[in-house]
Amino acid sequence: MSAEDTIRKTVTENDVVLFMKGTKMMPQCGFSSRVAGVLNYMGVSFADVNVLADEGIRQGIKEYSDWPTIPQLYVKGEFVGGCDIVTEMTLSGELDQLFEENGVAFDKDAANKIREHNA
């Protein structure tokens, strides 16, 4: 299976996917750690793909999304963005709305605490 096929399969078979450096339990870069941390704190169930484990996936995901950086978050097959975008969406409440619209379970109280802490 090609890297593109693997990426497409992963994105379509999981409601929420984070392509990241490292894993959700052991991130290996600050940006990946931040996004995984937000998702974990909000109680979101997500698949993590360690791009450091496969060079084909690492390069392929950048082509698949036409986005040059890692991490990359996908919700219901759609590319959401990287660390800066996910952070902005978390603080504005847009990420909550995206999860709600797509039937993704998350802890609303935790999301509110993130916003309160960063106000």
Where are these regions (language model features)?
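N-terminal leader/targeting and pre-domain segments
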Residues: 1-17, 114-119
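Structural micro-motif
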Residues: 17, 64-75, 81-84
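Thiol-based oxidoreductase modules, predominantly thioredoxin-like and allied folds used
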Residues: 40-59, 67-68
